[in-house]
UniProtKB/Swiss-Prot annotation:
NCBIfam families: phe_am_lyase (TIGR01226)
GO biological process, one term: L-phenylalanine catabolic process
Domain of life: Eukaryota
Naturally occurring in which organism (per UniProt): Talaromyces islandicus
Family membership: Belongs to the PAL/histidase family.
Residue positions where 2,3-didehydroalanine (Ser) is found in the record: S178
Name by which UniProt lists this protein: Phenylalanine aminomutase (L-beta-phenylalanine forming)
Gene name of the encoded protein: cctP1
Lineage: Eukaryota, Fungi, Dikarya, Ascomycota, Pezizomycotina
5-imidazolinone (Ala-Gly) cross-link site: A177-G179
InterPro entries: Aromatic_Lyase (IPR001106), Fumarase/histidase_N (IPR024083), L-Aspartase-like (IPR008948), Phe/His_NH3-lyase_AS (IPR022313), Phe_NH3-lyase (IPR005922), Phe_NH3-lyase_shielding_dom_sf (IPR023144)
Length: 703
């Protein structure tokens, strides 16, 4: 199963470990097993690291310090310990302790601005979650025993995390090679008690010495190489990269769930996700995506070819448009890229990324460039390109649902009332275009813009932290697009359910009017034929008038039915005109009654597949975001409630959804969906003819 669902397995593991970390509140840090979920939990302050007490880990730390001191005792030169830095490495000094202070001076050069909003937190500072992520990554790297950083120094950083103290770090100024020098220098300055560095706790910002004193912590003094060992690494880039990858995995899964919902809302076909198509082009991501969406459509009464045989005489589009039909081929490669990005970041989290590196087994010190964070840059650029691809697909799907010419019978702008006065989703459509334009811009690479730095010593540098920042921006934009898509999909599903119910009731009502009016004049066989033709006409004609106001739609429906009636009824024209008047009134009454009963108790979830049903119920029941009834929903000073609930702007409702995505509560719901998918076993025979998915798309799951 893992080979078929590699991305889902990775995402599920992430969600489960995050839940576990939150439950336990702590985890062990040993230099080799830091998980992306650990970084996220630390950043969000739901779990704190504790240092491993493994004697091997402790010994490794001390051994690296001993090797360094042995080199110094022999009078050997060690870069950054008794030499200058970077392009100034041709200088020498015996003042090894002072040299680490000089390193802090040359790297604590970032800009923090005075806030203009009265906040205590300086402007242009790094978000505190990102700083905490960097802190735990740096501690984990130091624990590997390659940096000549002693245990008390690592404990000092851990103590900040334990006490909820976060260094205030400038946002810009690192080229991420030689590591993230500037950001990590401010972390180091905080544990030193540098009075011009700041620490934050619960929104309160104090100079580091005072904050340490209030927490009962003492400043530390850096030994030879300990300053360099703390700042010469990729921790800021890798830490933020971990946060980005975690969110990207979740958004990838949500995008697939939303695609399943769009298939249902647009009455698309499940055939696009048939396992035969994926097997014929066996890219792992495509196979997984097709399998996932097919599972999400299980039990759907809206998607074609799920609970009914394939319609081989469709009179509308013979196949779905690309935004639905090519979803596995579009999303699949991005899942593969996200897995590689995850691997790159996971390796980086458990790597020694500074220079020089101490090998205590050979008692040697090696010069290299493990601080060159190009692996993180590579991961981040894959992530934000994937985000752009997801956004592009969601935008296309949203446009199809909102555009009356593309939606297959949904009303214009997904307005539940009269489209001449109600433009429900039009603004959302504009927002989506704005988000998509920005997301496309953000997808551009950072790596192609690097500049030579520091006496041309850093002639190539990764700009990994900047790349991660841009990827985080892309995550933010896609999160907004997903929130809009969730709102749009749920509205479209409600309207589809509402209009299907109306068509069913209107067809019955019209059949009754025909029988009452013409049964005495038309023989039974002819009458039955007329009723069947009217039924087909209502289904087809109603969907063609989505731009009209509702009463006009009812009139148009009956007007366009007149030729059918005339062909079957050879009666007085007055009878037919009278029937037309009655039929319009009957259909209008059916609409008003259907709308009223639906608004009071929507039955949409009964029609949905496994994926969209879970998402829909979460939005409607857990979040309390209702079916949007149109113009009447708009809040004004003298009209603030509807059906005993507060009215909100459309943006207000979407914001509620956005917060559930941003804070992760939506994924607590989707976790059950992921677990259901992973528990589904394949029952392939030798020729694959009995693939579970073939049964799934008929609503039969064999577990």
């Amino acid at each position: 199963m893992a080979s078929q669902s590699a991305h889902l397995v990775k995402t599920h593991q992430l969600w489960e470990l995050l839940r576990h970390r939150t439950k336990t509140g702590s985890y062990e840090l040993d230099g080799d097993s830091l998980h992306i979920a650990d970084v996220v939990a630390t950043a969000q302050q739901t779990s704190t690291p504790r240092l491993s007490e493994d004697p091997k880990v402790i010994k490794g730390l001390q051994d690296s310090v001993d090797v360094l001191f042995d080199h110094l005792a022999k009078g050997w030169y060690v870069y950054g310990v008794n030499t200058g830095f970077g392009g100034s490495a041709d200088s020498r000094t015996t003042e090894v302790i002072e040299l680490q202070k000089a390193l802090m001076q040359l790297t604590q050069t970032g800009i923090l601005t005075t806030p203009s909003d009265g906040s205590a937190i300086p402007g242009h500072s790094t978000p505190f979650e990102w700083v905490r992520a960097a802190m735990v990554v740096r501690c984990n790297a130091s624990l590997r025993g390659h940096s000549a950083v002693s245990l008390p120094i690592i404990k000092a950083i851990i103590n900040l995390l334990v006490h909820g103290l976060t260094p205030v770090v400038p946002l810009r100024g690192t080229v991420s090679a030689s590591g993230d020098l500037m950001p990590l220098a401010y972390v180091t300055g905080s544990i030193e008690g540098n009075p011009d560095t700041l620490l934050e706790k619960n929104g309160k910002v104090l100079p580091s010495p005072k904050a340490l004193q209030e927490a009962g912590l003492a400043p530390v003094f850096l030994g030879p190489k300990e300053g360099l060992g703390l700042i010469n690494g990729t921790a800021s880039s890798a830490g933020l990269g971990a946060l980005v990858v975690a969110q990207a995995h979740s958004l990838a899964f949500l995008t697939q769930v939303l695609t399943g919902g769009a298939v249902e809302a647009l009455r698309g076909s499940s055939e696009s996700f048939h396992p035969f198509i994926a097997r014929a082009r066996p890219h792992p991501g495509q196979i997984e995506c097709a399998r996932n969406i097919a599972y999400f459509l299980r039990g759907s009464h809206l998607s074609r070819d799920v609970l009914a045989p394939k319609d081989r005489r469709r009179e509308d589009l013979a196949q779905d448009r690309y935004s639905l039909r090519s979803a596995p081929q579009w999303i699949g490669p991005q899942l593969e890229d996200l897995l590689l990005a995850d691997q790159q970041i996971s390796i980086e989290l458990n790597s020694s990324c500074d220079n020089p590196l101490v090998d205590s087994e050979t008692n040697d010190i090696y010069y290299g460039c493990n601080f060159q964070a190009a692996a993180v840059t590579s991961a981040m650029e894959k992530v934000r390109l994937a985000m752009q691809m997801f956004g592009r697909m969601l935008f296309a799907q949203s446009t199809e649902m909102i555009d009356v010419h593309l939606s297959g019978g949904l009303p214009a702008n997904l307005a539940a009332d009269n489209p001449s006065i109600s433009f429900t989703m039009k603004g959302v459509d504009i927002n989506m275009a704005a988000y998509m334009a920005e997301l496309s811009y953000l997808a551009n690479p950072m790596s192609s813009h690097v500049q030579a730095a520091e006496m041309h010593n850093q002639s190539v540098n990764s700009m990994a932290f900047a790349s991660a920042r841009i990827s985080h921006d892309a995550i933010d934009v896609l999160t907004k697009m997903c929130a809009c898509s969730v709102f749009t999909v749920c509205q479209a599903l409600d309207l589809r359910a509402l209009h299907m119910a109306f068509i069913a009731d209107a067809t019955k009502a019209l059949a009754s009017t025909i029988e009452l009016k013409f049964s005495a004049k038309v023989e039974a066989g002819q009458l039955n034929s007329l009723q069947m033709l009217i039924q087909a006409h209502v289904t087809r004609a109603w969907g063609l008038t989505g731009k009209l106001d509702l009463h006009a739609r009812c009139e148009s429906l009956i007007d366009s039915a007149l030729p059918i009636v005339l062909c079957h009824v050879a009666g007085d024209v007055a009878d037919i005109i009278e029937w037309k008047t009655q039929a319009i009134e009957v259909v209008w009454n059916v609409w008003t009654n259907t709308f009223a009963s639906f608004s009071a108790a929507p039955h949409t979830s009964q029609l949905l597949g496994a994926g969209s049903r879970l998402l829909y119920n979460f939005v409607r029941k857990t979040l309390g975001v209702p079916f949007h009834e149109g113009f009447v929903e708009h809040p004004t000073a003298d009209s603030q409630t509807l059906h005993s609930r507060p009215k909100k702007t459309i943006g207000g409702w979407i914001t509620i959804i956005h917060e559930s995505i941003r804070r992760g509560s939506i994924y607590n719901e989707l976790l059950a969906l992921a677990e259901g998918l992973l528990s589904t076993k394949r029952t392939d025979g030798a020729n694959g003819a009995n693939c579970t998915l073939c049964h799934e798309m008929k609503g039969e799951i064999h577990v």
